[in-house]
């Protein structure tokens, strides 16, 4: 998963298999920086299977931090954009997959694909506020309304069952 910085200058993307975070110039499309989330080194490692398995990245509203869902590590990684390093990790439930930040920067929400739930954390303390079961066992995407009143969670159908959108 990937997102563009609030100022539109950079595109951030993660690679699940190599466990890397990429900062890409949004104008000339050149890769500016790469960060290994497995080793926190400032260079690209030989291809390996990441234990972190990052699946989504989203910037904070200020653009100073990046929130990354570590599906294989059951953690959210918070990266300081200026220093280009992991500054904090938050233990999650099983399989954080997609992540969204509230427009005021106070909360992050992640789908927990292996738990059939979504969790809400405060960004100032990294503390879980709530865990909410979804209508099916496979939550996927999440987006927060601009007024921060609602989160829309796409959940996958099972077998012939249609997918749904849960509103929390």
Positions of predicted regions on the chain:
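Predominantly soluble domains enriched in secretory-pathway, periplasmic, or organellar proteins
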Residues: 1-168
